[in-house]
Amino acid sequence: MTEAITEAAVASSEEVSEERDDLGPLELHDSGTFQQVVNLLDIIDSESAKTDTTGAGLDMRKTLASVIIMEKATTEPSVVINTLIRCLQVPEISTQRKVNIYNILQDIIQQEGELEEQCVQRLVAIASKEMREIPEMEGYMKAEVASDTLVALSRNHFSLVMYELQHHLKPLNLTDEFVIITLAKLANGNVFEFMPYMGITLATIFTMLRLANEAKIRQAICSAMETFCETVQFYLKHLEESVYPVMTEEEFALKVFPMYRYFVTVWLRHYNPEVKLGVIKSLKPMLGLLLPNDDLREQVYDYIPLLLAEYQGSLEVLFVTQVLRQILELSVTTNTPVPQMQLHTIFTELHVQVCNKAPAQHQYSSQNLMEMVHCFVALARSYPKELMKFFFSQMETNKEAVRVGTLNLIRAIVSADEPRMSIRAIYLAIRVVKNTISDTRSKVRMAILHIIGQLALCGYQERIKGWGLKYLSVQLTLSTYKLTNRREKFYQRDLEERMVHKVTMDTVKIITSSVSGMTTEFWVRLLCYIMETDYVEALTPICISLTNLAEHQLHGQDVDVSVAGKSRQVDLPAPQKLLARLLVLMSSPYKGEGRGIAMLNLLRTLSQSIAPSMADMWELEIALLVRYLEEHTEFTWDQKAWEDKLIQFLRNSLKKTRGSSWSLRLSKELNNQIASFDSPSLEKGFLYRALGFTLATGLEASKVEVLLLELLYKTDYSNDFDSEGVIMCFGLCARGQVKTVLNVLHDFEERIQESEQSWQISAWRKDHPWRRETVKSALMVMYSCVASYCHPQLLLNLVDSPITAKIIHHYVSSCQDICLKMAFMKSVVQVTKAINNIKDLEDFHFAQKTTLTSIIVAVIKAEPTDNLVSPVRALAMEALSHLSKLKPFYSTEENSELMDISIHSVISLQLPGEDNESIKTLYANALSSLEQLMESLLQRQLDPKGLQEMVQLLEKWILSEKEWEREKAVSLHLYLMWIYVHSTAVCIHLKLGQFGTMVGLIAPCTCDAHQRTRMASMNVLSSLLDLHASQTCSLWGPSKQKELEKCKGDLQSTDVEKIFCASSRIAKVVCMEFSCDEVVSLIQKLCENTGAMNLQHDKASVTWIAFFLQMRAKELEDKVAEILSAILVHLPVVDHPEVRRLLIDGILLLAHHHQETILTSLLRQPLPMESHLAEVWLAVSENVPFARTMLHSLMGRLQSRLSPRISATSKADIWRLAAVDPLMTLCTIHLLIQKLDENDKLPDFLPDLIYTLLLQLGSSHRPEAAPPVLKMWKLVHTTPLPEEMNLQRVTIKSMQLLFKRVKSQHLAHTLDEQAVWDLLQDGGTFLEGVSLLARLCMQHVEGHRQRLAELVLRGMDSEVLSCRISSTAVCFMSGPVLYQEKLLKPAALLLEKGADQEEDEALRVLSLRALGNMALGAPKKVKQYRKVLLEKCLGPLREPVSNSVTAEGMEALTKILAELREGDVGSSFDAMSEQCRIFFDNESELLRLKAFILFGKLARVVGMSKKHFFKGEVKKAWIPLMLHSQDPCSNAAQACMATMFQCVHFWGWKSLEHPSGPSDTATDDKMTVFQTTMCSILTRKKPAVLYRFLLETMAYVKNNLSRIRIAACNLAGIIMKQMSTHYLKKLDFPALRNSLQELQLDPDPGVRRAALETLTVLDSCSQHGFLASPQGMS
């Protein structure tokens, strides 16, 4: 870009140098500044393009770039200007860029002032060239800025610029358009510098006129000439300031005139309208130079026809008229009128413009008309006679537009400013006007009236006294007649006539205020106009005019000769008639442009003529009335107040005439005026009022009666307005004539009763049978109106009879249609109001109250409840409200009944539609009457009880499903709350819970779907809060008040979420104001109303419950049970899941803060568990942490039954320790476990829960341990419980669910395979099942062994027997867990304690078993605890209590001995050996079994130290061992044989240790062989022992066990066979024989057979009588 600019600059320099030899090529002085300016220009160009594209304003970057260039120019102007000039010389530069550069150059020139001459020359040359190029669309803009640049340079370099322009301005050579434009700009901006060049410039331009054929160059020349002439005029005015050689005004005029002539004669006829307009605009400044010249002025006149010809063209005529006005006005000023020969042409052309409607294209028609008027005024001053003659000729055309236009011109001429028009001109003008007064067209009449008024205003009053006033009177009468008899079809004519009347009134006002010496005839005409006209809008100006005239006459100013000798009083009609007329008209003082003040002023002026006695009073009173009207407008005044003032004025006036018949005559006039006004109207209403007041002051009762009867007969009772007016008139009359009024009514009733058969009056005509009811309605209201206006002392004597009695009679004796009902209600209201208004009623009892009440109640009940067709019910309730204030008062029951009936009658009505205004009014009145009645009835019981009864009556409507019923009920509630709050003088505290109940009723309505209901509910709530605050002396903080106001605003929203949020915030704000009791009552009411309406109401209720519980839960410890009960009672009836869930969430919220109370209350619910209660627990299960907490608490409840009862130290303890049904507790646990996530293994309390359930199951198997409270809980089961719902089954189901969570298939399989659940369910096998379950838990429930062990130890230490038993059964001594968890010692101590107790056998057995199991679980610790173990296990052997205990003791010893040595056993070995042998022959198979096993274990343990002792024990035990080897109990027999063979070695005989014989031989045979061998050995080695064995054996023949008896017989035989003779001889054979023979009687044949065999052996031994040797016996 820079290179292109440089090349262009050099090329341009060469070109310019050809034109200017003194300018050399440019040099670059500062390449940095040059480049910066170029870059800034690029920014300007780019931003300009963006601005053009987007349509946005000037960009900030463009402005900033321009500012930077300007700052650069401040420091380096030449460099910047040269750079900009170079940029202009680029060949293909855009037009916009050139425009931007020229604009910057203009700013720099303006900023810097003088520049370097070389720069200026170069810039002038370039700008001149740009300006003179053929302008295209964009080029025109470029030429314009180039021209502006030259003008800017001319301020400091005028000569250079002027030289350049003059160089291109050559005679007879048409120059460029912008050269002329620029010269005009130079002349305008440099007046004095340009003047020396003005002459040559004008002369040169004149030579170009013939060459200028194009429109643009002609427009440019015209515009330049306009500027040149204005500049010359400025120069001539400031001639003394010029320092250049000057030209005179004449010289300038001579220079201009040729051009003026050429413009008018040639260019003005150009077809182009823009050229024409340019010419016309240039003529005005040119004429400013030409017209002052006397010689040239005459020549200018010659060209006027050419100007007038332009009116026929399309040119805007305003500019032509302005030129003509300039010529005509200067002709008057210079007193050189235009030639008379041109007058007719001027008159005609201008008159046509005035009278004809301007073409649509002429936008300045009104301004043109004003200019025309000035032209005619100028012509009238020069040629008045000729002009009026022309006007006269034009008026003869009979065209309305021509006549109106001409008359308007005459009016303008008459009203011409100084100098005033000549008298001759005025005289001639009036002649023209008089010639047209017979024209009846509206516009012509108005124009004539305007001229008459204008003549009066301009001081020509004498010229209109005759014809003018007469014409005015005629027009006043004519226009009034036409307006009062107008027809609808001729609206346009009526509008025109109204305009004529308005102009007439204005003219009358002008004349009466300015014309002196007014004729009496005109006065009379105006006065009669007031009395007769029906067109009341004309009254104000007429009254003003009359007042002015009357003041002139009364003050003697310019009195007419005909009345000069008369009195100062003004001639008037009858004074009473005039006063009546004016009073009635003044009742609407602002009609007719404020006629009230005008009439008051007239009345004050005529006071001496109307009633001299009232004059002084009227002077004061009327002034006050006028002041009142002046202080108000028709928008601010009060009709009632104004009428009261007029009535008071009338009463004060009548007082001045007291004692005369003046008031009676006035009454007649007022009565006569009634027919003059339509019904309805304010004037007629005031007439009835004024008539009533006037009649009340009448002295002659008979004449008053006549007037009243006349009024009754002539009244049309079908017209409500007239009927009401007569009623009011009678009432007002009753103030002073009550007896007269009642007599008239009675007389009228009798007459119509008589005429009812003959149909003599129109009221009873056959074709209008309904009229009878209309008259009766009017009579009822008349009686009540008489009561309302009657004097209080007279009323008490007349109210029951005849007034109320007549009202009731007329009602019950008619058809009782709607109109009659309304009249009856109005009558009752008026009568009761009148009674209530009496201040001192004393003990007055209204005798008719009961009758009236019954009638009214019947009417209300008869009204339809679904629609509203009349105001009857509203009036009925209003009547009841007034009746309620009279004695005898209604009772409380009657009050409630009236409230209920009235509420039902109104609230059930549906809201009216928006388009039915009449129904809306009826509806509003009914609602207002209901409020008034409720207020009256509430006032009789203004205490909390009355308030509560009122709220109870409204409650069913507040909870209605119909929104319109809710809205009205809540609105009524609000109104009554306001009454209660503001009417209670003494603060009576609400009952406990009443505040909460009322808030609970209304709070959900803040979320109602209807906005008005929400807002009314909010206001009710505010009233309740204010009442509560006043009673509790609590103050609302500003923050709370502000928050409530904000919530109130949010309730107006239509967003449901926003509404609920606002209601929640309200609950949050107010909840702290409630006591705990009030919170309970609130929640109870909210729960009670849940489900009564709709879902939105229910959501709002539970939302409030939730917020109150959330905010106040901690404080409600004593009320939790009541709240929970309220929620649970109503929860089953709630259908919507969301609402149910919110209520349940409220329960859970309470449970978080008062867990024990809630838990106890829930557990005390009846079984089987209802669905809503199950839903509560399901909700608990969804909150896993809380569910765990609840499970802990439930476990605690079960555990508390198995622990000693403790004393409660807190309220929570009381609830925790309260008795609950364990079955409900177990069912709840089962439900929670079932609903919790199956993947949740409940690691934190799984062992506790398992253990607790085991304990519960154990206690259920021991019914004697169950608490007596269970019997009580069985009573609440309303239905029989299912079979599966018992303690054992529910407990086992719960345990099964718990073990499923262990996720061990092997455990589940083992539990089923070993039938653990069946064992646990059966009480007989429970302990076995517990032990088995405990072993399985140790194997499969990893991670919980320590906790289970701890729980077991705690249970073993419990005071509850069942708990100790179950815990001991679970005791994990058979496993290593106790040892591993270092719990072995406490376990041993507890087991030791259990083994010692004697109260329960099972516990002892289990304790011993557990002690014995130490050898299995902690064998290494057996030696440590050997003393305790041996002692506790030996105890049952030493002192046997039961077989099971002894057996368990022996088994435990057996287990223990396995881990001990002989030395460890110590002295206990002897005891064990001795005690063990005792049980060899025990009847219990178990004991025998355990004894044999233990003895065998002892045989293994015995060492060297005890071997000898035990050898003796073996000898002692040998016979039992050999005999019990054949024990009937197979297990015992096997154990015994094993033990026996284990003890054989103690005999020291090797042959016995390995018994001979085959192994497959039978056991009995083996035993026989062993016995035989044993006996043979003993015979040889220890025959004495064998002898003792025989005796011991024979003792067993009497054993209880048959098998033992058989074995004894067989063993005895074997011994006897092996016994030596020596010892045989010692035998007592008889005794032995007897013993064996006794066995022959044994029931067992085997015994008998064995005994027989033994007996045979015995006999054999005794027969031989010798001692057999051992060898022989073998």
Swiss-Prot record:
Disulfide-linked positions: none
HEAT repeat ranges, renumbered to this chain: 73-96, 97-133, 195-234, 254-292, 382-419, 424-461, 573-612, 615-641, 642-679, 739-776, 993-1030, 1221-1263, 1381-1420, 1627-1674
Pfam families membership: HEAT_Maestro (PF21047), HEAT_Maestro_2 (PF23210), HEAT_MROH2B_1st (PF23221), HEAT_MROH2B_C (PF23227)
UniProt keyword annotation of Plastid present: no
Entry GO CC: cytoplasm
Disordered, as annotated region: 1-26
TM segment ranges: none
Gene3D superfamilies the record matches: Leucine-rich Repeat Variant
UniProt keyword list: Repeat
PANTHER family, sorted: MAESTRO HEAT-LIKE REPEAT-CONTAINING PROTEIN FAMILY MEMBER 2A (PTHR23120:SF14), MAESTRO-RELATED HEAT DOMAIN-CONTAINING (PTHR23120)
Protein name: Maestro heat-like repeat-containing protein family member 2A
Upper taxonomic lineage: Eukaryota, Metazoa, Chordata, Craniata, Vertebrata
